[in-house]
Swiss-Prot record:
A motif ('HIGH' region) lies at residues 122-132. It comes from Mannheimia succiniciproducens (strain KCTC 0769BP / MBEL55E). This is Arginine--tRNA ligase. Its EC number is 6.1.1.19. PANTHER family: ARGININE--TRNA LIGASE, CYTOPLASMIC (PTHR11956:SF5), ARGINYL-TRNA SYNTHETASE (PTHR11956). The gene is argS. It catalyses: tRNA(Arg) + L-arginine + ATP = L-arginyl-tRNA(Arg) + AMP + diphosphate. Its main location: cytoplasm. NCBIfam families: argS. Signal peptide: none annotated. SUPFAM superfamilies: Anticodon-binding domain of a subclass of class I aminoacyl-tRNA synthetases (SSF47323), Arginyl-tRNA synthetase (ArgRS), N-terminal 'additional' domain (SSF55190), Nucleotidylyl transferase (SSF52374). Keywords: Aminoacyl-tRNA synthetase, ATP-binding, Cytoplasm, Ligase, Nucleotide-binding, Protein biosynthesis. Pfam families: Arg_tRNA_synt_N, DALR_1, tRNA-synt_1d. It comes from the Bacteria.
Amino acid sequence: MNIQWILSDKIKRAMIAAGAEQNAEPLVRQSGKPQFGDYQANGIMGAAKKLGLNPREFAQKVLEQVDLSDIAEKTEIAGPGFINIFLNKNWVAQQADTALNTPNFGIKTAHPQTVVIDYSSPNVAKEMHVGHLRSTIIGDAVARALEFMGNHVIRANHVGDWGTQFGMLIAYLEKMENEHADAMQLSDLEAFYRAAKETYDNDEEFAVKARSYVVKLQSGDEYCRTMWKKLVDMTMQQNQRNYERLNVTLTEKDVMGESLYNPMLPAIVEDLKKQGLAVEDDGALVVYLDEFKNKDGDPMGVIVQKKDGGFLYTTTDIAAAKYRYHTLHADRALVFSDTRQSQHMQQAWLITRKAGYVPDSFSLEHHNFGMMLGKDGKPFKTRSGGTVKLADLLDEAVERATLLINEKNTALSEQEKAAVIEAVAIGSVKYADLSKNRTTDYVFDWDNMLSFEGNTAPYMQYAYTRIRSIFNKTDVNPTALSAAHIEIRNDKERALAIKLLQFEEAVQTVAKDGTPHILCNYLYELAGVFSSFYEHCPILNAEEPVKLSRLKLAKLTEKTLKQGLDLLGIKTVEKM
């Protein structure tokens, strides 16, 4: 149930019937203040201006053409030409009943698409650090939202599994195996990488072997490929533990590393040359883009093949876009990476389109995000200034949540307490990030994120358990409850029912724009509206028809909160 879409469709048809152009947009939005209705159509003035008409007169014409009798109890023209729409409470009650009794609340996209989502993308032989958190959890929330709406989602974990460093890493893995080292030493990937680099820098014989392994690996040598695969597998096994702790849906099957595109690169570069897009410059192959200027105001050069024959990230990203369209048959490809990658992605995709590798209808979207900062406003680091490992961050979250929950509640069993601690710990880290507009930097603050007040995971999780507890206190017959209907008798019930019906609008925005904070804001507002309803509308002490109706509103709120948090990858618990 997407009220915004229903109203937009009806008002757009009426605008066209009243003389507006076919592409006129009604710009229907949720109203910010009750006196202006539940929804407003703000596109009337723009359409009237194009027609040379008085906006209020045109608004009147539109209202004469539109039939909202089943949906709205009244409409009014406000200000210079806004249309305010007040929803009919009986229609709202019926829609809320339908949402409660329909799988997925009846939410389903009319036009399912195949969507590739490129997210997380850690490097092989290195441990995941806090810098991987945002891509991993934002990408996953968007993947869940798109899937929930009925799209076919292909997760693409674009891991850094290729490059000259692999000669060094293979040679060091071989050295360790020859020395019969315990495989457990590889549990610390950072130490492994550092030791390999140190050996490479200080042992010329080792360095010669490492360089020879680079060449062998790139030419498909079986031994080097086997050793390389071991490194990839060991890394991804460790990453998988992080994904599982984070309640992220990525698996080893979703790995589509840089190496996947290697076979495509020579042909792409050759084709760019043939088309005259890539030209030789000082031995390298460069594509000059008029759309980007260097500091002298000349077209910017983007290297696609180095002087030594090596390929670059740009070449790989061109290949990835081509692969996602031609091989995966995607309609959209979304990449979740740091804002600092924005120009790089724009250039790679511009070359992709200039070369004709994908049609204009194929949507290539870079969903960029800002940095995670410490309280000092600088990039988040350890006290000694080092990179914070993701596993260490999650461990600290559990330690802090343990102290918090032990202070709050001793009535839980040990098993229940462990579940609450894990849900609150991981949920707090994720929600603190997901609730911020992804395009901005944000300050990582343990005290704020673990608070039971405000727009936080603990507050949302507690709101859910409070509603669950209502059903533990009632002896209402489940058959009687399912047979009952929602009836709206006052403004608090009406406000809650309308807010519940706006769930799809929030999910749809996340799916379209890659903005999970919209869903967080919606859930927080829903919890607030429910709290006000609960305060003013007694449930358990109400008379039977009223009690059943209010219980159904509470049940729909419970389901919506649980589903909404699940789309964010945040666990709920039955008791807190």
